[in-house]
Amino acid sequence: MTVAREKLAGRALILGVNGQDGTYLARFLLGRGYEVFGGRRKGSSNWRHSLLRVVDRITYLNIDLSDPTSINEAVSRTRPTEIYNLAAESSVAASFEDPTGCVRTNAISVVHLLESIRSHAPQSRLYQASSSEMFGRVDIVPQTETTRFRPQSPYAVAKVSAHVMVQMYREVYGLHGCCGILFNHESPLRAENFVKRKITRGLAERCFAGGRPIKLGNLQASRDWGFAGDYVRGCG
């Protein structure tokens, strides 16, 4: 993809570009005149990008977040003005099945990324996607940026670690790193293993095809929900 340099608003590297949030963020930044580089796992599908008609406007990079060399190559090659880390193992349930893998993906990879930025793009601005799961068992409603973290899952612990690590690199090394604490947000691009898609797909199947029972997790959980397309505007 060729972009006229004089018209660029910035150069954005989006890690996790093929996910729900990455897709909406890519469209938003492209609309603002950015050159967008998309970091993705090798072999991952671009079906969301095809739906939003941005697949031909993104420069894709296959990045292994467990490999510091892979991250270094991506950052040094693109020299981004802004980096958005939306890549994560996003299933709380899956984090109990593989806590080590979750910590590796959601925490250690962030250290690799911060070190890469410090070495190859110290002037770039980093956005790290944090999660309301970090609050865990809460005593205060609603929560704020100063509410104490009480993580209740490997996923939440990993997210807290990444959140604090970005803070440390900002204060110790002077990197421009910030975290956005995201609460639940959905869209038609959400994967079907998440609760709202489970419910809507299950209802549709039962209405039209007499589908199977809908299996859900904790029915006592209470969450705020937003639209992913709105959330990424806050990120960008």
What are the language-model segments listed below?
Residues 1-185:
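N-terminal Rossmann-like NAD(P)+-binding domain of SDR-like oxidoreductases, especially those catalyzing
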Residues 139-142, 164-236:
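NAD(P)-dependent short-chain dehydrogenase/reductase
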